[in-house]
Regions:
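N-terminal charged helix/coil linker that caps or initiates catalytic domains
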Residues: 1-50, 270
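Glycine-rich phosphate-binding loop and adjoining beta1-alpha1-beta2 segment
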Residues: 11-14, 75-113
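Conserved N-terminal Rossmann-fold NAD(P)-binding element of oxidoreductases
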Residues: 51-53, 76
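Hydrophobic/small residue at the entry helix of a nucleotide-binding pocket
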Residues: 57-58
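A structured beta-alpha segment of the ubiquitous adenosine-cofactor-binding alpha/beta core
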Residues: 98, 102-152
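E1/E1-like adenylate-forming module used to activate ubiquitin-like modifiers
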Residues: 139-243, 278-290
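Mid-domain beta-loop-alpha active-site segment that forms a flexible
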Residues: 239-259
Length: 294
């Protein structure tokens, strides 16, 4: 029987003078008048953002959003920090080995300014918690573990039922690339993208299907045999430590563009399309179709 984890709730005291002083450097890029700048910043301030998975990308995004002026977060992650996380994850350290990732990230985020509201789901996203986590969110980021299927489907179903949540991002790093998968109420649902039953066991065939659908493009190096060894044999996703900060920047920028409605931002393709930035070849592109059907 699983131990029931207690949820931590942070409720900060809002100080208007402190808030506007701490986000002051944002404002010059947000409008042509002080009124326009503040109205756009207020959209970010008042948004409720859910981050499902607070590892290498999600944890860093949570802290960046607080610095940018977001005041309302919901964080979920069932995992505990281990030694291998120190290579890339915000909050991972020898001191925090064995501690819940969402709890550590929430603690760090709250300590930055103490004027924010954070709900922590240390049990992560489950069939039972998905709708409660989604409730009240304007945007949700799916940064859950690569091998999650059933609970990921539950989160996406909760999104499609939500009247408030506008869209979801799923942004994995693959080698030296960052992929941006966008889900809306009208996009292809993730169950159709994956084409895997929610109760499927993680067999080599299922793992290869996940690789195909989450990693649309791969470089020739390293070879497929080595990737199969990691993903299929060891059931572990390799992540190059320099890449999560790239994903963090892209993710936070896209969130800001959408939430603040910054003039000039383009709409990225929704699933089954995607956007990708590759730091190895220094290229970026938009893909508008189901890549696996080619």
């Amino acid at each position: 029987m699983l131990q029931k984890l207690e949820r931590t709730i942070y409720r900060g005291e809002y100080n208007s003078d402190l808030y506007w002083e701490r986000v002051d450097r944002n404002l010059g890029w947000l409008g042509n008048s002080e009124k326009e700048q503040k109205e756009r910043q207020e959209k970010l301030r008042d948004a409720v953002i859910g981050i499902a998975g607070t590892g290498g990308i999600g944890g860093a995004v949570a802290l960046r959003l607080i610095r940018m002026g977001v005041r309302n977060l919901k964080l979920a992650d069932p995992d505990q920090f281990d030694i291998t996380n120190i290579q890339r994850q915000m909050g991972a350290s020898l001191v925090n080995v064995g501690r819940n990732k969402a709890e550590v990230v929430a603690e760090m985020a709250y300590e930055l300014t103490k004027d924010v509201n954070i709900d922590v789901f240390p049990e992560g996203i489950t069939m039972e918690s998905a709708e409660e986590f989604m409730d009240g969110c304007d945007v949700v980021m799916d940064q859950m573990d690569f091998f999650q299927i059933r609970n990921r489907y539950a989160l996406h179903r909760a999104f499609r039922k939500s009247d408030r949540c506008r869209f979801m991002f799923k942004i994995p790093t693959v080698g030296h690339s960052v992929f941006v998968f966008t889900y809306t109420k009208d996009s292809m649902p993730i169950e159709e993208v994956y084409g895997i039953p929610e109760n499927a066991d993680i067999t080599p065939e299922v793992t290869r299907r996940l690789m195909e659908r989450i990693m649309p493009e791969l470089h020739e190096f390293p070879g497929q045999d080595m990737l199969d060894h990691w993903f299929v044999d060891m059931e572990r996703m390799p992540i190059f430590g320099a890449c999560p900060p790239l994903a963090e920047g892209i993710l936070v920028e896209r969130l800001a563009h959408e939430i603040m409605d910054i003039p000039g931002h383009i709409k990225l393709p929704v699933q089954p399309g995607y956007a990708v930035f590759d730091s190895l070849t220094w290229t970026a592109k938009l893909v508008e179709k189901a890549w696996w059907a080619e």
